[in-house]
């Protein structure tokens, strides 16, 4: 749901492993190795997000429109609004047990049924608001640039005359997984938390769900050994931050 750092039992996908099957005649000698990161325009990020989201949708089991999950998400979507910084959004539910949700730069917002089973509507609103924050604040774009800065993708970009339009379906799927599973810095997570809080207030939604979602996740973290989440703020601390903001704003 990541509220990304908070996901349980998440594995980090290998990025664009399909690149290793490309014809290497003359390609590996390209100037791709010189890139430190792949520079992408907003339009390129959107195009790649369109392609990656479409590929992920094709592999997922999507809740039917008449399902309780889809009906709940429609209610939540109506409360949150239909755009991120002017970018139209579309919402779908993936039928999977993962406690997860993500948003991409093209407005692709996906929520896993496992998260909806665990959270109330207000908590799901808060989680989605957090994910929208990662998009609105440019964190997702930076994550894509990092993903495309790997050696394999630099080779693909250089050999194919540009990354957009050159990736196979498997590569796009792996890119999508990399974006969904990306970890953000403590600062980025805190910024997305505050974005969600502010968005909820602006939309007339109680921000309490943001605090209680963290509190639920804090219980899941109890007794956890050292893990990939150690670089991120603890859920209990993030919940307290939201409680402090609510208190300062006179919200019970």
UniProtKB/Swiss-Prot annotation:
Record's keyword terms, sorted: Cell outer membrane, Disulfide bond, Hydrolase, Lipoprotein, Membrane, Metal-binding, Metalloprotease, Palmitate, Protease, Signal, Stress response, Zinc
Cell compartment(s), UniProt: Cell outer membrane
Essential cofactor(s): Zn(2+)
Lipid attachment points (S-diacylglycerol cysteine): 19
Ranges for region Disordered: 224-252
EC number: 3.4.24.-
Induction entry: Induced by heat shock and low osmolarity.
Topological relation to the membrane, as annotated: Lipid-anchor
GO biological process: cellular hypotonic response; cellular response to heat; cellular response to UV; proteolysis involved in protein catabolic process
Residues annotated as catalytic: 131
One Gene Ontology cellular component: cell outer membrane
Cofactor note: Binds 1 zinc ion per subunit.
PTM info: The intramolecular disulfide bond improves the stability and the activity of LoiP. It forms even in the absence of the oxido-reductase DsbA.
Pfam families reported for this sequence: Peptidase_M48
PANTHER family (alphabetical): METALLOENDOPEPTIDASE OMA1, METALLOPROTEASE LOIP
Assembly information from the UniProt record: Interacts with Era and BepA.
Record's function text: Metalloprotease that cleaves substrates preferentially between Phe-Phe residues. Plays a role in response to some stress conditions. Seems to regulate the expression of speB.
Family of this protein: Belongs to the peptidase M48B family.
Name the record gives this protein: Metalloprotease LoiP
Gene: loiP
């Amino acid at each position: 749901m990541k509220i990304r750092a908070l996901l349980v039992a998440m594995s980090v996908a290998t990025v664009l492993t399909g690149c290793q099957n490309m014809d290497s005649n003359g390609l590996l000698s390209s100037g791709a190795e010189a890139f430190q990161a792949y520079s992408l325009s907003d339009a390129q990020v959107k195009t790649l997000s369109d392609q990656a989201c479409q590929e992920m949708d094709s592999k997922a089991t999507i809740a039917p429109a008449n399902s309780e999950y889809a009906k709940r998400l429609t209610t939540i979507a109506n409360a949150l609004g239909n755009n991120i910084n002017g970018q139209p959004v579309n919402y779908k539910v993936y039928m999977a047990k993962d406690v997860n949700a993500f948003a991409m730069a093209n407005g692709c917002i996906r929520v896993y049924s496992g998260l909806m089973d665990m959270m109330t509507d207000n908590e799901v609103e808060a989680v989605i608001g957090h994910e929208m924050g990662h998009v609105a604040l440019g964190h997702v774009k930076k994550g894509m640039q990092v993903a495309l800065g790997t050696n394999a993708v630099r080779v693909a970009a250089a050999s194919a005359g540009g990354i957009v339009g050159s990736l196979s379906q498997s590569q796009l799927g792996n890119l999508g997984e990399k974006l969904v599973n990306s970890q953000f810095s403590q600062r980025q997570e805190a910024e997305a938390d505050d974005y969600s809080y502010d968005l909820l207030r602006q939309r007339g939604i109680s921000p309490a769900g943001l605090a209680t979602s963290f509190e639920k996740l804090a219980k899941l973290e109890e007794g956890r050994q050292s893990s990939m989440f150690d670089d991120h703020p603890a859920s209990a601390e993030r919940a307290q931050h939201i409680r402090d903001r609510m208190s300062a704003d006179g919200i019970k």
